Amino acid sequence: MRRLLFVAATVLAVAPAASGATTSPCALVTADDAGKALGVKVGTGKAQTLGLYKACTYAKGRKTLTVLVRQIDKKTFEKSAKKNPPPVFPIPGIGDEAFSAGGGSALLVWKKGTEVTFTFIGVSPVVQTQKDVANAALKRL
């Protein structure tokens, strides 16, 4: 029994402290963030699971921003990102690695084992707008 308590105490002592970070897509991208990216005020995001991803969708009229989040290693992320609709090209200055896909309709970002994908429908935000929403989300990751 003492040995078990010692092991438990040791594990607790070396375990990292919990941080305020999240992988909830509706927490990573707020309604304010989504509204700025879409150019319209949006309500609360709709959280759901889409296949391997946790998702959050913000919509107003025909404008939609969907945020997809999953845990993934870098090599698999790169391979997956390059399979998106062309053109697919790297975007510097976001996370550890990022790609634009589908003529700017999607931004795929990888940081420390987490993929965050942003898909835009009904709006064609400039790259800087995409970077702004991505960097805001990554600060919360």
Where are these regions (language model features)?
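A short, solvent-exposed beta-edge/loop patch
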Residues: 20-21, 88-141
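N-terminal "mature-domain start" segment
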Residues: 19-53, 87-91, 129-141
